[in-house]
């Protein structure tokens, strides 16, 4: 594939740092981009995605769908020669399963005493 057909992308993380730029074929899918981001993610960050499903990519204000190709996601103004397209990365970690809370039996519950005051 000729080099001029490749699309150069960089990915802006939540703290303003970048991953990339990398060159991709216009037929590469968003899912492939996410896998690359996860593998190249800086290990010193506080938030680290565990899988590609923890990441959302945004380009030109739109959340990109996994099945779309790079060519389908490019905005019309991205056709500038030799320009690097910046896509924003949002990390949404999968919710962890909450541990079931231990139910306190009525007999085990501590007794609470109440008092009331009456002002006459």
UniProtKB/Swiss-Prot annotation:
Keyword Transit peptide annotated: no
The protein's name: Membrane-anchored ubiquitin-fold protein 4
Result for mutant: residue 117 to S: Loss of prenylation and membrane localization
Free-text tissue specificity from the UniProt record: Ubiquitous.
Propiece span(s): 118-120
Superkingdom in the source lineage: Eukaryota
Any Pfam family the entry gives: Rad60-SLD_2
Lipid-bearing positions (S-palmitoyl cysteine): 115
PANTHER family: MEMBRANE-ANCHORED UBIQUITIN-FOLD PROTEIN 4, UBIQUITIN-LIKE PROTEIN 3 HCG-1 PROTEIN
Span of domain Ubiquitin-like: 7-73
GO terms for cellular component: plasma membrane
Gene3D superfamilies found in the cross-reference section: Phosphatidylinositol 3-kinase Catalytic Subunit, Chain A, domain 1
Conditions for induction: Induced by pathogens, cycloheximide and ozone treatment.
Membrane topology, record value: Lipid-anchor
Localization (cell): Cell membrane
Misc. comment: Heat stable and remains soluble at temperatures exceeding 90 degrees Celsius.
Lipidated positions per record (S-farnesyl cysteine): 117
Cysteine methyl ester: residues carrying this PTM: 117
Task performed by this protein: May serve as docking site to facilitate the association of other proteins to the plasma membrane.
Keywords (A to Z) from UniProt: Cell membrane, Lipoprotein, Membrane, Methylation, Palmitate, Prenylation
Record flagged with keyword Membrane: yes
């Amino acid at each position: 594939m000729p080099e001029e057909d490749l699309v150069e992308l960089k990915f802006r993380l939540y703290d303003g740092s970048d991953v990339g730029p990398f060159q991709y074929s216009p037929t590469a899918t968003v899912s492939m981009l996410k896998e690359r981001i996860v593998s190249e993610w800086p290990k010193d960050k506080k938030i680290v995605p565990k899988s590609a499903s923890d990441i959302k990519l945004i380009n030109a204000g739109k959340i990109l769908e996994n099945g779309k190709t790079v060519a389908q996601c490019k905005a019309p103004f991205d056709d500038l020669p030799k320009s690097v397209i910046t896509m924003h990365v949002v990390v949404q970690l999968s919710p962890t399963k909450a541990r079931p809370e231990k139910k306190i039996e009525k007999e085990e519950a501590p007794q609470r005493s109440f008092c009331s005051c009456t002002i006459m």
